[in-house]
């Protein structure tokens, strides 16, 4: 299915993998394919998911480039200085890691996208708001490490960048 309609060459509702890659790029296509469904029902490639993935990946890339230094002075921060928000985020990361690992083992890639992509991006925004834009570097490093490791099987080019 394409955009909730049955694919058909005669009606023009048809898109090849090459066309998807040319239109959305490899990473957004892979996210949309993983989100298309992993049950016995017909998979539904939704162009709005691919378009949203392009935007989300671009915003994430720009945020990483502008806000995350390549090296962090961990000596100036102690891991014991976690506040309530740091502990909440650390616990959420641990919970999400478990859910995503189970989803990968069961090959339920839609659930992987839900937790490893959508939920982690929302978690970052909530954390930054709660910390008034001044996150703990240990938590931030763990967040990025978790995000990139969990998404590497689906969007390896982005994660290795």
Q: Predicted segment positions?
A:
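Short sequence/structural elements of tandem HEAT/ARM alpha-solenoid repeats
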Residues: 160-161
């Amino acid at each position: 299915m394409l955009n909730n309609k049955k694919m058909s060459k005669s009606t023009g509702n048809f898109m090849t993998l090459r066309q998807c890659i040319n239109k959305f790029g490899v990473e957004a296509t892979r996210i949309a394919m993983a989100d298309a469904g992993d049950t016995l029902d017909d998979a539904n490639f939704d162009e709005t998911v691919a378009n949203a993935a392009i935007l989300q990946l671009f915003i994430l890339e720009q945020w990483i480039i502008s806000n995350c230094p390549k090296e962090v002075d961990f000596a100036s921060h102690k891991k014991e200085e976690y506040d309530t928000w740091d502990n909440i985020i650390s616990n959420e990361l641990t919970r999400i890691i478990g859910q995503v690992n189970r989803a990968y083992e069961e090959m339920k890639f839609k659930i992987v996208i839900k937790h490893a992509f959508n939920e982690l991006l929302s978690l970052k925004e909530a954390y930054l708001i709660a910390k008034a834009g001044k996150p703990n570097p240990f938590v931030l490093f763990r967040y990025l490490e978790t995000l990139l490791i969990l998404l590497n099987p689906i969007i390896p080019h982005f994660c290795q960048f």
